[in-house]
Swiss-Prot record:
CDD domains: ATP-synt_Fo_b (cd06503). One of its GO terms (molecular function) is proton-transporting ATP synthase activity, rotational mechanism. This is ATP synthase subunit b 1. Belongs to the ATPase B chain family. F-type ATPases have 2 components, F(1) - the catalytic core - and F(0) - the membrane proton channel. F(1) has five subunits: alpha(3), beta(3), gamma(1), delta(1), epsilon(1). F(0) has three main subunits: a(1), b(2) and c(10-14). The alpha and beta chains form an alternating ring which encloses part of the gamma chain. F(1) is attached to F(0) by a central stalk formed by the gamma and epsilon chains, while a peripheral stalk is formed by the delta and b chains. Its main location: membrane. It is found in: Cell inner membrane. Keywords: ATP synthesis, Cell inner membrane, Cell membrane, CF(0), Hydrogen ion transport, Ion transport, Membrane, Transmembrane, Transmembrane helix, Transport. InterPro entries: ATP_synth_b/b'su_bac/chlpt, ATP_synthase_B_chain. Pfam families: ATP-synt_B (PF00430). GO terms for cellular component: plasma membrane; proton-transporting ATP synthase complex.
Length: 188
């Protein structure tokens, strides 16, 4: 086997180290040595005292400040949320009130328009009925005139026809006065 000089030197150091350890093997580890126990307690008390002082003077106030800031922020956020809720309630109430007003106005407008339309329709119906009544009355008058005129003509026509019939059937000439009186007796 090939042994380097560095490895050989390391072996010698290890032997010296073993000799030193053998000399100290009777000794106790200093932190566990009861001879030094009082000084350990002293430094422990000083360390914990300084640690307690540092925590109570620096860390706890900072944590308290953070907690207080957070509590203030939460309270502020709750106040702001309450204000915003009240504003939203006011806006909703205003909206509902305006919506109700708009609905009532729309109802009034629809009612008014309906009544106006009914009045216009009724007025037009009355005008048309009056116009038709007038035309009907005029037509009845004209019919009466035409009937009267026709009735007058019927009498003279009946007289002429009666004269012609008597002349042709009986071959006798009758006076117009006797035919007229006979036609008038029948109602023409």
């Amino acid at each position: 086997m090939f042994i380097s000089s560095a490895y050989a030197q390391n072996t010698e150091t290890s032997l010296e180290h073993i000799k030193n350890v053998a000399e100290r093997i009777d000794r106790v580890f200093p932190p566990f040595d009861f001879v030094h126990f009082g000084s350990h307690l002293f430094w422990l008390a000083i360390s914990f005292g300084l640690f307690y002082l540092f925590i109570s003077r620096v860390i706890v106030p900072r944590i308290g400040g953070v907690i207080e800031t957070r509590r203030d922020r939460i309270a502020s956020d709750l106040d702001q949320a309450m204000r915003m809720k009240q504003e939203a309630d006011i806006v909703v109430e205003t909206y509902e009130r305006k919506l109700a007003q708009a609905r009532s106005q729309a109802h009034v407008i629809a009612q008014t328009a309906s009544e106006e339309i009914k009045q216009k329709v009724e007025l037009e119906r009355k005008e048309i009925e009056a116009n038709l009544e007038k035309k009907l009355t005029d037509a009845e008058k004209q019919i009466a005139k035409i009937r009267d005129k026709a009735m007058k003509s019927v009498g003279s026509i009946a007289e002429e026809v009666a004269l012609e019939i008597v002349k042709k059937l009986i071959d006798v000439e009758v006076s117009k006065e006797s035919v007229r009186s006979a036609v008038k007796a029948t109602g023409y």
